Amino acid sequence: MSDNNQCVIVGIAGASASGKSLIASTIYNELREKVGDHQIGVITEDCYYNDQSQLSMEERVKTNYDHPSALDHDLLCEHLEKLVRGEAVEVPEYSYTEHTRTSNTTPMTPKKVIILEGILLLTDPRLRDLMHATVFMDTPLDICLLRRVKRDVEERGRTMESVLKQYQQTVRPMFMQFIEPSKQYADIIVPRGGKNRIAIDVLKAHIAKLLKA
């Protein structure tokens, strides 16, 4: 864990569609008034999927997006370190339909609180060392699958067949190999998804305590 108290970094990990984004956005919205709109931000690990613009679409769709090698954690670490030092960064934008980064970026200025959310955040010791608190969303995989099918079909233009095939071939095996074991690094394990009110209140209280430290 980082000793720098000027920027509190909270990492939220867990399976795809386990409620990470929901709990991150809830905490963000409920803490904005306390810390200030411009002093809290959310970074999604998905933004740091590797740039695959040099590959054909046929090659891009074969990428195992649930393996740590699919992510540019070097750049994510670099950006977090810059934010902690008080420097602004340009967060990449990733296209789920094109399976690569776009030319757009989102500027982010230094914050008092940064909430990270992503499936593989706790697998990287460099990222863990930058975090002041770590969270694992312990949602049953069958629930995650139902949510993922709905999300990917409705929001990302996927077919149900492709979502189920990906789940069987990479999502579930990679969860067992990488994501589930990373639960051991969580300070807080959250059951029942992103609407767990007690867990949200505990996290908010812990962040407030860290800000006062």
UniProtKB/Swiss-Prot annotation:
Pathway: Pyrimidine metabolism; CTP biosynthesis via salvage pathway; CTP from cytidine: step 1/3; Pyrimidine metabolism; UMP biosynthesis via salvage pathway; UMP from uridine: step 1/1. Its EC number is 2.7.1.48. One of its GO terms (molecular function) is cytidine kinase activity. It comes from Vibrio campbellii (strain ATCC BAA-1116). It catalyses: uridine + ATP = UMP + ADP + H(+); cytidine + ATP = CMP + ADP + H(+). It is found in: Cytoplasm. Keywords: ATP-binding, Cytoplasm, Kinase, Nucleotide-binding, Transferase. One of its GO terms (biological process) is CTP salvage. GO terms for cellular component: cytoplasm. ATP binds at residues 14-21. The keyword ATP-binding applies. InterPro entries: P-loop_NTPase (IPR027417), PRK/URK (IPR006083), Uridine_kinase (IPR026008), Uridine_kinase-like (IPR000764). Its main location: cytoplasm. Belongs to the uridine kinase family. HAMAP family: Uridine_kinase. This is Uridine kinase. SUPFAM superfamilies: P-loop containing nucleoside triphosphate hydrolases (SSF52540).
